């Protein structure tokens, strides 16, 4: 029997030393599930609400005891006795309990921790790994990693405006080989930075944050590192950017302080298009600000037929926001962050909507992570084809890569590495 007989939450720490919620679920047959909730540094205005205590005398206001209490009282009292295999029903019950459009009452961190722990317990009851339980027989695609190796913007103290510069080993034959390629590029880049007297300390997501003067200088350095590592930029290793443009958008303009320019939305679109023409950039995340819908339309019309344009702050893994974007022709890809929406069921609904509309999907971590590797399983379960989970440093990031390596091994001959086909209709 898969009835829930015990549900318990606790406050633990994430990779940035901030509190987060961890939930344990125990079923009648003894099956057990545990999930820890990630947290973002730069969050979209339309995300579900992460419940924090606000007590400045404890964890500088970032404690999550209110969310923990919500799990241990309100949520537990309601879910005890329910069948863990009825995931959608359980998620719906929690949404009804909360009763707000953005999970502000119980907190998305309380609801998500419970939702994922329930799924893990149900998978354990069936003797299945989470990826197989959620994805079924169609789950066999290993995602191409987007490896964040250079940081700027809000993730770094340097003049670079763009937040993340990533490499994608699209030419590898397997996930394990892709991870090896990424590691070799990462270490080659580290050596190159050191030889130039630049910092090789890593940020929240394991990427370097050197004092490089401009976006193009950063791209040139990465291109050189790819080549020195023995790979062909574009053909074997593609580039990807996360602009996090909302962070430097004000009064209708994009203020690129590092470039010393202020651009209109149309000029920003042209700026990004020029970068794509000069470098093998196949994917751009949040190229426009979350509420600059006209800018998103201009960017999509300009390069959306050849470059993956990923909506993070634009869509926040929310089906209603995504439906709006599909209707208006904004972007062509969905970034999937489970804590932006707050339940497994809603996450799967958003991915399904994106796929049906011909949008690609990218499973993603947050800057505040834990050793929990759930997103690796979900990337395979949903056939996302791409995963964004940091650099080749920090154990909280490597936990996801290592889990993907295990999943690829479990799948055996049925495993399929997405490769360049991860870009869907944009593949070339």
Swiss-Prot record:
It is found in: Cytoplasm; Secreted; Cell surface. Binds a second Mg(2+) ion via substrate during catalysis. The keyword Nucleotide-binding does not apply. Its cofactor is Mg(2+). GO terms for molecular function: magnesium ion binding; phosphopyruvate hydratase activity. It comes from the Bacteria. The active site is at residues 205, 337. (2R)-2-phosphoglycerate binds at residues 163, 337, 366-367, 388. Its main location: cytoplasm. It catalyses: (2R)-2-phosphoglycerate = phosphoenolpyruvate + H2O. Disulfide bonds: none annotated. Its EC number is 4.2.1.11. GO terms for cellular component: cell surface; extracellular region; phosphopyruvate hydratase complex. Signal peptide: none annotated. Keywords: Cytoplasm, Glycolysis, Lyase, Magnesium, Metal-binding, Secreted. CDD domains: enolase. Gene3D superfamilies: Enolase-like C-terminal domain, Enolase-like, N-terminal domain. Pathway: Carbohydrate degradation; glycolysis; pyruvate from D-glyceraldehyde 3-phosphate: step 4/5. GO terms for biological process: glycolytic process. Mg(2+) binds at residues 242, 285, 312. NCBIfam families: eno. Catalyzes the reversible conversion of 2-phosphoglycerate (2-PG) into phosphoenolpyruvate (PEP). It is essential for the degradation of carbohydrates via glycolysis. Belongs to the enolase family. This is Enolase. It comes from Erythrobacter litoralis (strain HTCC2594). The gene is eno.
